[in-house]
Amino acid sequence: MHESKLTRRRFLKGAAVASLAVTAPYVVPARARGAKGAKAIFNGKDLTDWDGYPRFWSVQDGAMTGITTKETPAPGNTFIIWRGGVLKDFELHVAWRLENHNSGIQYRSKDRGKWVVNGYQADMDGSSTYTGILYEEGGRGIVAQVGKKVTVGPNGKPKVTGTVSDAKKVKDAIKLKDWNQYVIIGRGNHLVQKINGIVTVDVTDEDEKRRAMEGILAFQLHAGGPMKVQFKDITLQVFGDE
């Protein structure tokens, strides 16, 4: 997430009113399911094709690892960036483990230089308060809370149009300080995030001025207190014109 924690608390106005009760299990659209032909984009041995602040990023026990300490704090939110291509229409699978604090997976994002990234973020935090939300780093802030189906209008304002899962069940399914899996799917302006097999958000972004149809992939190491985050089993499926 963004450095300012206050933006985290800007809950979507009227979300509770607009939310719809879950009457049946949410089903990801057929065109967004499956990852046949996915390829590994992290070799588990070194940081080939990945670019991050060397002081903070390394490979430990087969996992990409970001660490800050009291003696070596991050100067601000810093990211390790995949240099192997850009994300357009895709399905991404990532195993992750967070010991404390906050991190996230940036996708279709912008490289601002010096390992600073802005854009869509699949969020995660040590208490699972924000894990699963869609956040826009350096932009519109919280786009969708956990469990919500959201349409972002041309004016940039998110509107809850339905429910995709129960937020408490999502939180209960997250294994604190242990390995979890994120699946992120982007097709056109439609974005879906899943954690441990449960859909956390479903977003249609109709804000043509601020949405991103393509961009980079990166992982966040958040400014603030000491933290450790790890990523492994990173696979990417790229969808062509169909």
Regions flagged by a language model, labelled:
Residues 2-19:
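N-terminal secretory signal peptides and thylakoid transit peptides that target proteins
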Residues 3, 31-242:
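Carbohydrate-interacting regions of secretory-pathway proteins
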Residues 20-23, 242:
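Alpha-helical transmembrane segments and their juxtamembrane interfaces
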Residues 24-29:
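C-terminal segment of classical bacterial N-terminal signal peptides
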